[in-house]
Amino acid sequence: MKTLTAAIQFGSSRISAAAVWIDKSGHHEVASIECTSTEGCIRHGCVVNNEETAARIKSLLKKLSNRVKANGAGDIDAAYCGICGMSMQSREHHPSVLLDEDLRIGQEVKSQLEQQSWELQLTGKDILGVCSKGEHISEQLAVGDHQLIVAESRLAQGIRNAMERAKVRVVKILPTPLLVGDILTDEEKANGTLLLDMGAQLTTISIYDKGGLQFLRVLPLGCESVTRDIATMGLRSDDAENVKKNWGDASRPDTGSETMPHLDINLPLSELNIIVSSRLEELAMNIDLQIARANYKGRLSSCVLTGGGSMQKGLTSLLSKQLNISKISTRGCNNIRFMSSERKPHLTSLMSMLSYCTESCEAKPVEKTEGESGALANGTNKSKETAKTDSAQEVNLPNNSEKKGGFVSSFFNDLFAGVD
């Protein structure tokens, strides 16, 4: 018997949803993927129009449900939700527990330390993840070395409100920047690797070293800014996006006086590449500042790019020069067996969620009450009005119960703090 689960990733340029079958062995098989634009409803990862976001959620899940019904499944009425927003970042925390006389840190002590981190209460913030970097003993105390993934409460609450409006149960809120780290190898996590998830409006900076996450920041800057710059040359936004993807080269190759065909404007390739590279150099400068802030300047052995923006031509060359990292590669999700088309970098966040999705998201059939069954057996019929009332009473949406709490400092005041 297979389990049907579902995931929705709320990105900066698109909302992506997947329906997934899980067999008895725990293997995931993607049944369908659907995407829609976030324009007008989500900005920098935060919901700005609850009604419109809910409508797009309903539309996506209806499409997924129609796909899986061909295999005998029911409707999808729940989903895991992946979120990322500009307020999301890591924060060090050091919980402590008094040890017994043997001064031994066992699993029970580790669990107590982790629970303390989850229960940390700070006004207006959520804790979305806890990463342990180890423990040490100070006198008679076991002290945890934790990285908390935190964000403003409005980030997750906006998603909960939209899901409630769409009448879809939230199984769990997942911080996708933390999950995307699974695309790295153990060796990369051990030896200082910069992971850049490059979206339209957001760029997530994660630094891994000594086997785990050491630093995470989400910048409110993305590759959409390049599209806007190109559009100022007299192009529509969608045409500017196509020009950026198909012709732009951030490495600024020598193109002479060559121009792009099939355009109503005369835009030399050399000028286009200056536009593309200038904006990406600005992004690279901000990334470099965050590396310095994390005290990893000159200490990174490699860089891995993912996300839709990572496919920009010439980007690896530009970042190699700007960040002084020689080993740079682009990668999609590879930690679960998927079709090659599902491994593309722009789907990495969605695909990275799936190994964490284990609960059924399939709507349960509505059972008839004993009284209703008896009435049918006696050959009597209820009025349409009564039937509608019974149906409304029978179908109840489960309550959304997500734990709240967490911390993140004022974004722009904290973003560049400590950088000379």
Residue map of PLM features:
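Nucleotide/phosphate-binding catalytic cleft detector across ATP-hydrolyzing
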Residues: 1-14, 18-193, 269-272, 294, ...
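A short acidic Gly-Thr/Ser loop motif
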Residues: 8-14, 84, 187-188, 195-202, ...
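Short amphipathic alpha-helical segments
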Residues: 19-21, 93-94, 207-209, 316-319
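Helical "lid/coupling" subdomains associated with nucleotide-phosphate turnover
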Residues: 44-52, 58, 172, 182-184, ...
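Long, charge-dense
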Residues: 103-124, 231, 236-253
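Short acidic/histidine-centered micro-motifs embedded in hydrophobic/aromatic stretches
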Residues: 176, 246-247, 306
